[in-house]
Every structure is written in structure tokens, then in C-alpha cells.
């Protein structure tokens, strides 16, 4: 019987505080396999990059790839943070210096309809004893955000039959590297028993000892580098898979060295320093945010309206995590204030639907004020206050006014907000009744920075 080890990481999201221990663990396992003349594979399942971290922001993810090169992964795929959190040009060059293969079967250039040059749909690795392991990868499809970024993202169910059929006959063990989420993984397992192993990610689910669906082994290792997946495949002399032993190893149990903390802090310091070199504007007054102080929010609402070329904007105060003080403004200050990978959306609604949307917002206002938001691009703590520019709501008469005038139910109105408002479940009118246009490639912090630059030039 041959033993093949497969180690997998996923959804690190630039949580580099766990990286020294993860690297040490992976290196140790690879050394052990080499000494025992065993085959070992290492893969990453995407969302290794997340621009909340200043070093990731400052290098457009290139620093993350440098870290991945320390491992020498056999294969990686991308998550939505690489795919949508990068401009098309940034993603096209993210892996220029990578020493590993990027696998991805459902992303194509929107203009040429060809696969990106930095990716391939699959890879076959032959073990020391001749077992052929086929790896292929799929990432979560978000057409609303991939398309305006220049990509044609396709749904896995449309591609899986051909991908599975083309690979199954060539390999002994078939492995799907999935950045699709637990629900999709289970559906795929139920439909494609030809797949032997699905390595899961995206929804941050954790299988300490795996899960079996329709004879397909599922594995998943949580989020933020809190676990590393460790799988041992047992194959017979005919290279048939007989058993898969799955476990998730807690990073907290891994060896920690005294110098680890200095390395972790070094990543932050390097990121801050690089961002501080990039000056944006020279502002004459503080842009604060807090109780009764809305100057930073007002400046951002103005910037949003300028970028979208509209007269009305809506945003929430929980986005603003730090003030921007008077004097020279750099990209580090913008990033600390607005670390979220959020884009703007331009929304058009009939007047009747706009009134309903504002009523939804007012109904949820007190609930959302201190409501903790997790995910969907949000990197803060609570949602906060809903802030309008150009809209007014009369709480006594429940009337909504647009630029001081009553709203006409049959007329069309266009405003700008952040895409987060569309993704969270509190304002369904935006998605159900609205015509939404995503404004790429800038994040909200870049929109604010561009506005400050235009209004407050550096002498």
C-alpha cells in the first residue's frame, strides 16, 4: 500500500499572524515525507490575499505571493478576494513571480473568452510509486462583480461534466480544489461520485475529520490559518484509492518560536511604511468621525457622488474606522480608515421603490446602529448609522424628499452607495427592484482619496 500525503490551506485572508507556524508545519511535513521517500502535495484553496492587511494593500497582493513561494505549493487556486479584490490588471500580474501553478477552470477573459495566461484548468501529479493524482479547481461565481472587472466567470455546474470526464480517465485519484462553499461542495459530491476528494473553502467551514457524501470524501480547514488540512491517501498496488484519512490540525498546537512575533509585526510595519510613502492630499482640517461629528462621512459622500456623477449618496458610519487628520494625507491613513474591499454601485429605482427602500432603511436604523456585521466585504465591527446626502426622511409624516422635493412615484431616480448594501439582507429593494451598476476598479478608500486629491492639492 502506498501512502500519499496532501496538505491544504485556505482562506488565510492575509491573517499573517499564523503564517510562521503554518510555514514551519508544512516544511516539517515535507521534510518528513522526503526522508521517508513518500509523496506529499501542498495546495492552497484561495483567499490567501485580503487587502485589509496594509502589506497586501501596499503590494497589491505581491507580498502574499512571496510568502506562498516559501512553501513551493504544488497548486493553488483563487478566491473572490483575489478575483474581485484585485483590478483585472493586478490579477493578471499577481502571479508573475509565483513558483507554483495556479489552477482555475471557470474564469475567462471577458473580451477574448480565453483562460487567463496565469492559470490552467488542471494538473496531473504522479506519485513516487506511479499513482496519478488529478487536481482541478473552481472558484465561486459572482457575475455581478467579475463582469465589470473584465472577467467572464462561469458557473461550475456548466463546466463540471466535461472537466470530470476529461480527467477521470487519465488519473487514479481525482481531487477538486473548491472555492465554492460547503453547500456547493455537497451538491457536487452528490452529482459526481467520480470525484474522490473535494477540498473545500470559501464558506470557512471546518471538518475536523472530514465528511463523506455519496462516497466522495470532503475536507475543509476553516479560516484565517487557524487550521491546516492534513490528509493521508492510501492506494493499493493497482493505484486504486482504498482510504482517505482526513484531519484538520489546529495552528494553536503548532510550534511557536520567539522570533515569530517580530516577523508578524514586520509584515505590518513594512505595509504601513510603503503606504505612508504614497501621499494623496494636504487637507486644511481634521476629518473626524464619531458622535455628532460627520466631516469624514460628508467628505466620503461627496466623493461618492463625484465618482458616480449623481446627486444623492447613501453610506453607513460603521465603515469609518479611523479619522483622517489635517495636513498631509497618505494611503496608509485612507487604508486605516476604510480597509474594506468595497466598490461603489450606482442604483436606479422608480420613485415608488425608492420610497420603499428608504422605509426599509428607517425601519432597520435602530437595529443596525450597533449590529455586528461579518463578511460581505465588511472589515469593521458594527454597521452604524445610515447617512444620506441629498435624501431627507420626515419621521413624523413618513415622507421622503429627493434634493428637497417630493418623490414622484413614476419617475426614475439614481443614487450611489456601496456594494455592501446590496449583499446584506436588510435592504432587499436594491437587488429586487433596482438597476445596479458596479463601478470598478476603485475601492471606496480610493474614491475618497481621488476626491481629496482633486480638492486639496499638495503644494
Regions found by a protein language model. Give the residues of each.
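Active-site proximal loops enriched in glycine and acidic residues that flank catalytic Cys/His/Asp
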Residues: 8-10, 202, 316-318, 348, ...
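A short C-terminal boundary segment appended to hydrolase-like catalytic domains
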Residues: 237-329, 452-459
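Feature captures C-terminal
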Residues: 325-459
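C-terminal extensions
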Residues: 191-194, 198-205, 309, 314-353
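A broadly conserved detector of short glycine/acidic/proline-rich loop/turn motifs that flank catalytic sites
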Residues: 137-140, 222-224, 237, 318, ...
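Acidic, metal/ion-coordinating pockets
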Residues: 1-250, 292-298, 303
